[in-house]
Amino acid sequence: MTQFKLGHAAENEWQQAAERVVEQLGDCSDANLAFIYVTDAFSNELSKLLRYLKEQTGIPHWAGSIGNGICCTNTEYYDQPAIAVLACQFPKDSFRIFDMAQEEQQAPPAASPNDFSLRPAVVHGDPRNGHLPQLIAELPEQLGNGYLIGGLTSSEQHYFQ
């Protein structure tokens, strides 16, 4: 597998959109992380959609969000039911999914003083979380030589990340 594969589709039914995405992704047997973005129209079906995609692709780890629109490779979906998935292949143990909004969860591992490698973090934030500014402010310190990528969820009804 190439390190990244993209699949995206706009259909009225989530099943049809998901089938098109899986078809575009092709063989993902080496992928170990996927990013999923859906528009508001599919937000009520997100758990079914995610279950289907996990079963069809075999990708174990997923992160993403819901938005009013999705932009991907020369295509923009706005005000219509759409899905975009980026399947990724990373070295084992080179990434970690964490939820800093949950108090019982640990923060990302701190960088050691001798670690000069770039440590990117893809961050999705719930705009209703009053602690979000503080959580985001703490991330660079915890990441060390970190680089934050991402944004706030922009949805009309759900704020899943």
Where are these regions (language model features)?
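Cofactor- and metal-binding active-site motifs of prokaryotic enzymes
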Residues: 1-161
